[in-house]
């Protein structure tokens, strides 16, 4: 409750609160503020999980990304290219290179909207410096999806500073909060190494 009160106080009306979790914590997280819950993504890590548990349960290679907000969220869908353009309309056999065919008024689609599964490998975890460290690419994706360039991103569980690196790569400002001095030092070092 106290954390939600702070989130409500500082979040913009169209801002997103983006939290990562795994079951059973995901369910508890959603139920802790069902009123602000919007939806979730599944992050397919493609690698990971504990092989020690593989004989009693499936190896977990996914994690939940849970989205909360006050109102209608800013959402910038990150499109993925189609292998072949698809035309929709009366004359859908006619495909042009432009997004709108001037002659047939058909809409030509060259991209897909995102699905709720984010496919970003976490294979480079050999160099991780925090037990729950996420790939920079995952945070870049989420930051681009829910913010404009120049906006401010808060990470109140900053760990090794991955959010800061993703913000620097996507031209966003950031505030990091981390309670363990060891990880503050690691985050500062990573940021200093990234900034030219």
Protein language model regions, located:
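Conserved hydrophobic residues forming the short capping helix/wall of the S-adenosyl-L-methionine
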Residues: 191
């Amino acid at each position: 409750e106290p954390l939600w009160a702070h989130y409500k106080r500082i979040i913009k009306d169209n801002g997103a609160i983006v939290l990562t979790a795994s079951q059973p914590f995901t369910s508890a997280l959603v139920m802790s503020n069902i009123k602000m819950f919007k939806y979730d993504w599944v992050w397919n890590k493609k690698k990971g999980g504990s092989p020690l548990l593989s004989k009693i349960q499936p190896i977990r290679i996914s994690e939940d990304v849970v989205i909360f907000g006050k109102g209608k969220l800013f959402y910038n869908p990150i499109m993925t290219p189609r292998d072949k353009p698809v035309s929709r309309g009366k004359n859908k056999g006619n495909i042009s290179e432009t997004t709108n065919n001037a002659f047939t008024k058909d809409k030509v689609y060259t991209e897909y909207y995102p699905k709720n599964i984010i496919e970003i490998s976490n294979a480079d975890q050999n160099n991780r410096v925090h037990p729950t460290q996420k790939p920079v690419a995952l945070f870049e994706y989420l930051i681009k999806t829910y913010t404009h360039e120049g906006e401010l991103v808060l990470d109140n569980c900053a760990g090794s500073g991955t959010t800061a690196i993703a913000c620097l790569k996507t031209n966003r400002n950031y505030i990091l909060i981390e309670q363990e001095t060891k990880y503050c030092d690691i985050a500062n070092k990573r940021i200093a190494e990234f900034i030219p």
